[in-house]
A protein has these predicted regions:
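Conserved functional hotspot residues at active sites or interaction interfaces
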Residues: 2-64, 115-159, 216-268, 319-365, ...
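Extracytoplasmic/periplasmic/luminal assembly and interaction segments
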Residues: 57-99
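Short beta-strand/loop motifs in extracellular/secreted proteins, especially
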Residues: 74-77, 111, 154, 164-169, ...
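Intrinsically disordered, low-complexity Pro/Gly/Ser/Thr-rich segments with frequent PxxP/GP/PP motifs
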Residues: 81-98, 175-206, 283-310, 376-400
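A general "mature secreted/periplasmic domain" signal
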Residues: 82-86, 91-101, 106-111, 116-145, ...
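Hydrophobic, ordered structural segments
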Residues: 93-128, 157, 161-163, 189-230, ...
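Short acidic, flexible loop segments centered on an aromatic residue
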Residues: 155-179, 264-284, 360-379, 407
């Protein structure tokens, strides 16, 4: 048996040796690849589009008792800034039902297109001022400022400016639970939805929405009353996503002793968290702490002396936040301030009302701020230094303003004029696209 195994092993070794000799004598075969040829491909961004939500919506007629009556009242003024681009769809200077602005251009930012809508309201059941940026349609978003109870009316303005139908899912987050609602929108359709048809006697709620495929415009209109007296109106666009750091700019306290600003917090997470709230003005600093339970709200009255404040809300768990602020003069009105986006460069049109610019520096070092204010063909340049955790305010006069800095800043426009009060919280306008280098083998 051992002899047979040895014979098989010797035969295998001889075969392996012979195969190596044969392979060594075969001609070598080489494989060559073509020289890579880089191709430059230009990918242009889509036309930049923003949407203005339109004029004030009156529910129930002027008397408030006409069941099912929903009307747009008057017109909202449109203030467009157009940079080095061309309008595909011109928004015009007035709108009732809402309007689009669509432009082509290379510089995809507010330097290409920036639009604001504004409207003063004077009705038997509603007085005040509404203003907001006209923003890009979005696939999803949040609102913190919901209120649907006695003396508090909320109306959702939902528009589908696309050429495709879509389904919008609304999730109303109320203390102790949630209420779901779906709205189907045809291409180009606008839906006006009084929240009272869905929820009632909920003085506090947040809202999350999401679409089934195409971006939409969603705005929240609010009206406040006390008995037969009007207490103001407001128009808000979606807030930023819940975050562990919320930065709020342009809180002007002008009603000390009447109605304190109220900070609302919502914790969408599953664990409790403590919010550290810092309110800073030129002559006052207040630091507060507030526990926010999971899937719950907390409201904090900010006992602040009159002045201009920036607000920072920090937490270990992402929170949604906003401040409801009231002014007394020149008209009793309110506005919701929500977290601000950070910019290095921002261009805004200036509404034809008494408008102040607030710019805040939440960074650790001072920043240099450069302003370019245009009035017709005239341009005025100004520069300022803003210390760390400080805010700069300037009364504006002109058609548009460009704000630029090497460091990150936040900004807000505040209107306090005869019709009332509004805070305009800008957002970036941008579609992505650039030149690509593609290597083809």
């Amino acid at each position: 048996m051992k002899i047979a195994s040895r014979i098989v092993l010797v035969i295998a070794l001889i075969g392996l040796f012979i195969s190596q000799i044969v392979v060594a004598q075969l001609p070598a075969i080489s494989t060559s690849f073509a020289t890579p040829s880089p191709k430059a491909v230009a990918v242009e961004p889509l036309p930049l589009e923003v949407y203005c939500p339109g004029a004030f919506v009156e529910v129930g007629g002027e008397s408030g008792i006409e069941l099912g009556q929903i009307d747009r009242i008057g017109e909202a003024s449109i203030y467009p800034f157009l940079g080095s681009g061309n309008f595909i769809v011109d928004p015009g200077l007035k709108t009732t039902a809402g309007t689009r602005a669509v432009v082509t251009g290379d510089n995809q930012s507010t330097a290409l297109l920036s639009v604001i809508q504004a409207q003063g309201i004077s009705r038997e059941r509603a007085t005040g001022f509404m203003a907001s940026p006209c923003s890009q349609p979005v696939f999803s978003g949040w609102f913190i400022s919901g209120a649907a109870a006695l003396g508090q009316e909320t109306v959702m303005l939902i528009a589908n400016p696309s050429e495709t139908e879509t389904l919008v899912s609304l999730e109303f987050l109320v203390p102790g639970g949630k209420i779901l609602k779906q709205v189907s929108l045809a291409a180009g359709q606008t839906e006006v939805l009084p929240v009272s048809s869905i929820i009632f006697q909920q003085p506090v709620f947040a809202l999350r929405f999401e679409t089934s495929g195409v971006p939409v415009s969603v705005a929240m209109q609010q009206r406040a009353t006390a008995g037969l007296s009007t207490r103001g109106v407001d128009l808000q666009l979606p807030s930023l996503e819940p975050a562990v750091e919320n930065l709020i700019t342009g809180l002007s306290v002008r009603s000390e002793g009447f109605e304190k600003p109220v900070l609302r917090l919502f914790n969408p997470g599953e664990i409790p968290t403590e919010a550290v709230i810092s309110a800073v003005s030129s002559n006052n600093v207040v630091v507060l702490r507030q526990l926010v339970e999971p899937e719950s709200f907390a409201e904090v009255q900010l006992d602040l002396i009159d002045g201009d404040y920036l607000l920072r809300v920090e937490s270990a768990v992402p929170l949604l936040s906003g401040v409801r602020n009231t002014i007394l003069q020149p008209a009793l009105d309110f506005s919701w301030l929500t977290p601000a986006s950070e910019f290095n460069d921002l261009t805004l049109p200036v509404p034809n009302y008494k408008t102040r610019l607030h710019v805040a520096n939440f960074g650790l070092a001072a920043l240099i701020l450069n302003l370019e204010i245009k009035t017709g063909s005239n341009v005025e340049y100004q520069s300022f230094e803003i210390a760390s955790l400080s805010q700069f305010s300037l009364l504006l006069s002109g058609d548009s303003i460009r704000i630029n800095s090497a460091s990150k800043f936040t900004a807000a426009l505040e209107v306090i004029d005869v019709p009332g009060y509004a805070v305009i919280n800008p957002r970036e306008n941008q579609n992505f696209g650039d030149a690509l280098s593609v290597t083809v083998r």
